[in-house]
Curated annotation (Swiss-Prot):
Name of the featured protein: Nuclear polyadenylated RNA-binding protein 3
A single MF term (Gene Ontology): RNA binding
Keyword tags: Nucleus, Phosphoprotein, RNA-binding
Domain RRM stretches: 330-401
Segments of skewed composition (Acidic residues): 37-73, 101-139, 149-158
Compositional bias ranges of the Low complexity kind: 22-34, 260-276, 593-614, 651-661, 717-738, 770-785
Residue numbers carrying Phosphothreonine: T86, T451
Compositional bias annotation for Basic and acidic residues: 159-174, 277-293
Length: 802
């Protein structure tokens, strides 16, 4: 049994033919045995039982052998799938046949038992012979099975060798492919490293101390954690880090001589926004190292980080006042700016890397930037003087002005922070030498070669948005060259208006805080004198219509019959103006110069208050540019002037309106002033002065010189001479149109003599006869009783106190 088991471990499953033969032999033996048993009926029962036991043992041994063979086949089938499939089919067939043999054996055993029960007389000799035959047959079968198993083992070994060879070849192919992929990846990596980095691979020249300082400086600055830095592109991050390291002398990069070419190319690739076309980057200057941020590229849109800094600047600009302690030489002058398309945002992007900007002013073709220290101004001049901005090189200088800048409140658009806006196109090179000074008397650039048609003055209390709207309406509605000036405390409105009329400006517009405008238009009289018309508290559209009418009349280039114009229907649907008595040709001095503008007749204006100017309504025979019958405290903003009125009896051409003083007065009429005139004279006096006048009038009502004392007190409060006041109380004084227009202005408590509004003309002094008449007038007026005037004054004061 041991030999059979050993052979069964090595050999394969026997072929189906052999198994069938063995089963057939067993069946034959069983048949023979059954036949012999049938013959020998006399055999004892013990022998039969022994035979049965031996047969059962043989069957069990065969089953064990078959089981071992099946296990061997399963193990071999795992190594070779194809062989396993064929062997499994053979095993199934063998098991089916074996099952059939077992069934046959069982049937035979049952038959034998029946035969044994029937035939008890079988012989022992027959049993021994059968056993010998069975042993011989079993030996034959075992020898045949061992031979077939050896053959199957050799076939399986050959198959194993073939499969191993195939596996080795597959492994070799996969290893070769992997090696090729690795080589290609290494080549790509080395190629990318060579393209991107050209730094020297010699690590012996690395300054580890400097590297540690740089790393520590970057980590201590907390720059990497800032959200503004994290949103930057990779190139801008590198440039920002380099700029920060170079700003400190301890962490600045030092380039060895033999590595300068490589390092400069690397830094040039990191700072792609640099404008240098040279391959070699020059060493950084101290000003460049002090830059807080990389230089902006105006060809690209504003970044988020720049937008945040500009928003912070606008927020802080509103809080800056003139009381700040601004160091000297911290104001940068910028010249050669384009006339258009320059904004505060552009200048902020260019100059903010050099220091903290407090304020930006943009004028016409130049501007100013206020830093908080003079070093920032010097750095900006050093770095930006050679750079191209707006397609040209800017003129950068330290501003020579020592005055504090005028700070604007709010950003109202391009150039809104300046004091001057113009629609005229004036080249940068043809301006006067003082055009850069933003602190001159007028606060705007004065050109000696060019005069505009209209000047717009904006009060400090006026709305800038409305002022810009008025400017746009004049520019688009009239087509005239217009300048708009934002008034400042140092500006004298009267001087500005006087200069405008003297320079030939057609008219001026004053923008009020009540969203309306006041207009004064200038024109030449028949003898070359300058006259003016005044319109108070009108809309911007009406002001545009006035200037359009002036434009049309000037384009016609012919004398205008203003009396005839008053008969025509007004273009705005107003009724025709009344025609006063007098000649119908030429510009009479007593007529209103409305030029088709829809103004109510003078009779209607007498019943209306005269606005903020403190002037009495004109009479029916008095032109709009004529003087009032008595001197008034006329307020045009802060501008005040006092001018004697013309005589009503004599038609003399008007001079410079209320800006022109008259010649020696003519003999006045003896008509006393009425109550309305006295009320107009004292309506602007302070309350304490009114009380003093009332008490003095009550005490000195019976004295003959009461009027003179009261008039003297009024003169002292109005800043006029007593002699001039007495002449005005007595009547109208004449004006000489040929005399130059002297003017007495009172602005901020200072008496300033304005320049003449028209070119001076030759004139003769008044004859002695007129001087004698003047002296007689003064004496008669001093001797005149003051009862009626004092009583009227008392009534007027009583009304004012009510």
């Amino acid at each position: 049994m041991s030999d059979e088991n050993h052979n069964s471990d090595v050999q394969d499953i026997p072929s189906p033919e052999l198994s069938v033969d063995s089963n057939s032999n067993e069946n034959e033996l069983m048949n023979n045995s059954s036949a012999d048993d049938g013959i020998e009926f006399d055999a004892p029962e013990e022998e039969r039982e022994a035979e049965r036991e031996e047969e059962n043992e043989e069957q069990h041994e065969l089953e064990d052998v078959n089981d071992e063979e099946e296990e061997d086949k399963e193990e071999k089938g795992e190594e070779n799938g194809e062989v396993i499939n064929t062997e499994e089919e053979e095993e199934e067939e063998h098991q089916q046949k074996g099952g059939n043999d077992d069934d046959d054996d069982d049937n035979e055993e049952e038959e034998e038992e029946e035969e044994d029960d029937d035939d008890d007389d079988d012989d022992d000799d027959d049993d021994e012979e059968e056993e010998e035959e069975e042993e011989e047959e079993g030996n034959d079968n075992s020898s045949v099975g061992s031979d077939s198993a050896a053959e199957d083992g050799e076939d399986e070994e050959d198959k194993k060798d073939k499969t191993k060879d195939k596996e080795v070849e597959l492994r070799r192919e996969t290893l070769e492919k992997e090696q090729k992929d690795v080589d290609e990846a290494i080549k790509k990596i080395t190629r990318e490293e060579n393209d991107n980095t050209h730094f020297p691979t010699n690590m012996e020249n690395v300054n580890y101390d400097l590297l540690q300082k740089q790393v520590k400086y970057i980590m201590d600055s907390n720059m990497l954690n800032l959200p503004q830095f994290q949103h930057l592109p990779q190139e801008e991050k590198m440039s920002a880090i380099l700029a920060m390291l170079n700003s400190n002398s301890d962490t600045a990069l030092s380039v060895p001589p033999h590595d300068s070419t490589i390092s400069t190319t690397a830094s040039a690739s990191a700072t792609s926004g640099a404008r240098s076309n040279d391959q070699r980057k020059p060493p950084l200057s101290d000003a460049q190292r002090r830059m807080r941020f990389p230089r902006a590229d105006l060809s690209k849109p504003i970044t988020e980080e720049e937008h945040d800094r500009y928003a912070a600047y606008l927020h802080g600009e509103n809080k800056i006042t003139e009381m700040h302690n601004i160091p000297p030489k911290s104001r940068l002058f910028i010249g050669n700016l384009p006339l258009k398309n320059v904004s505060k945002e552009d200048l902020f992007r260019i100059f903010s890397p050099y220091g903290h900007i407090m304020q930006i002013n943009i004028k016409n073709a130049f501007g100013f930037i206020q830093f908080d220290n003079p070093q920032s101004v010097r750095d900006a001049i050093e770095c930006e003087s050679q750079e191209m901005n707006f397609g040209k090189k800017l003129i950068l200088e330290v501003s020579s002005s020592n005055a504090r800048p005028q700070f604007d409140h709010g950003d109202h658009g391009t150039n809104s922070s300046s004091t001057f806006i113009s629609s005229a196109k004036r080249p940068f090179q043809t301006e006067s030498g003082d055009m850069y000074n933003d602190d001159n008397g007028a606060g705007y650039k004065k050109s000696r070669r060019h005069t505009v048609s209209c000047n717009i003055f904006v009060k400090r209390t006026a709305d800038r948005t409305y002022a810009i709207e008025v400017f746009n309406r004049f520019r688009d509605g009239t087509g005239l060259e217009t300048d708009m000036i934002f008034l400042k405390p140092r500006m004298e409105l009267g001087k500005l208006i006087n200069d405008a009329a003297y320079n030939g400006v057609w008219g001026v517009v004053l923008v009020n805080k009540t969203h309306n405008v006041d207009v004064q238009t200038f024109y030449k009289g028949s003898q070359g004198e300058t006259k003016f018309d005044e319109y108070i508290s009108i809309s911007a559209d009406d002001a545009v219509a006035i200037f359009n009418n002036i434009k049309n009349n000037r384009n016609n280039s012919r004398p205008t019959d203003y009396r005839a114009m008053s008969h025509q229907q007004n273009i705005y649907g107003a009724p025709p103006l009344p025609v006063p008595n007098g000649p119908a040709v030429g510009p009479p001095p007593q007529t209103n110069y409305y030029q088709g503008y829809s103004m109510p007749p003078p009779q209607q204006q007498q019943q209306q208050p005269y606005g903020n100017y403190g002037m009495p309504p004109p009479s029916h025979d008095q032109g709009y540019g004529s003087q009032p019958p008595i001197p008034m405290n006329q307020s045009y903003g802060r501008y005040q002037t006092s001018i004697p009125p013309p005589p009503p009896q004599q038609q003399i051409p008007q001079g410079y309106g209320r800006y022109q003083a008259g010649p020696p007065p003519q003999p006045p009429s003896q008509t006393p002033m009425d109550q309305q005139q006295l009320l107009s004279a004292i309506q602007n006096l302070p309350p304490n002065v009114v009380s003093n006048l009332l008490s003095m009038a009550q005490q000195q009502q019976q004295q003959p010189h009461a009027q003179q004392q009261l008039v003297g007190l009024i003169q002292s409060m109005q800043g006029q001479a007593p002699q001039q006041q007495q002449q005005q109380l007595g009547g109208y004084s004449s004006m000489n149109s040929s005399s130059p227009p002297p003017m007495s202005t009172n602005y901020n408590g200072q008496n300033i003599s304005a320049k003449p509004s028209a070119p001076p003309m030759s004139h003769q002094p008044p004859p002695p006869q007129q001087q004698q008449q003047q002296q007689q007038q003064q004496q008669q007026q001093q001797q005149q009783p003051a009862g009626n005037n004092v009583q009227s004054l008392l009534d007027s004061l009583a009304k004012l106190q009510k």
